[in-house]
Design a protein with these regions (language model features):
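Cofactor-cradling patches in redox/metallo enzymes
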Residues: 17, 37, 89-91, 95-97, ...
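A short, N-terminal amphipathic alpha-helix
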Residues: 17-24
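A conserved beta-strand->alpha-helix junction
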Residues: 24-41
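Short, basic/glycine-rich phosphate-binding loops at helix/coil junctions
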Residues: 39-50
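Single conserved hydrophobic/aromatic residue that forms the stacking wall/gate
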Residues: 1-15
Length: 156
């Protein structure tokens, strides 16, 4: 059985993913609480950091700790993150944090770098096949604003 947990307490778009993820059999979608104050607390002072910067590291810590805690509380044997499929995410950081949280909570962490072996391209194909929503920013407001600025500058 697979559980998909939406852990990004700061995610701007949640409902669409939750509805679309219900497509798969044997997949349970667990929508974590929307608690943006947790994200804003760890992002304080890092608002101007670019994607892949220190703000992202702190966000990875927040997400993976919440995931590991949930896994422990609900009797899961292992946890991981799909964030490593993105070419914009630092898989080394994700895995280092995941291993640390595994040790802290006593739940195994599945090392991941899903973008390898054409994983990112395959994810795009699967998204098309299953008509899944794909956004072009990580989900936090700062990343969204950065992406909007990049798009605006490309039009000029």
């Amino acid at each position: 059985e697979i559980l998909i947990g939406l852990v990004g307490s700061e995610m701007c778009i949640r409902d669409r993913f939750t509805q679309e993820a219900e497509f798969a059999r044997n997949v349970i979608v667990c929508d974590g609480a929307y608690e943006p104050e947790k994200f804003y607390a760890i992002a304080k002072g890092l608002e101007k950091e670019p994607e892949r910067g220190r703000r992202c590291y702190k966000c990875y810590e927040l997400r993976l700790e919440e995931t590991a805690r949930y896994a422990k509380e609900h009797g899961f044997d292992i946890f991981t993150t799909t964030l490593s499929i993105s070419p914009h995410k630092n898989a080394a950081w994700l895995n280092e944090i995941g291993e640390r949280m595994a040790e802290k909570y006593g739940v195994a962490y599945l090392y991941s770098d899903f973008k390898k072996k054409n994983g990112y391209a395959h994810s795009i194909e699967l998204s098309r096949e299953y008509h899944l929503y794909r956004q072009d920013y990580c989900g936090c407001i700062y990343s969204r604003l950065e992406r909007e600025e990049q798009k605006k500058n490309k039009r000029i």
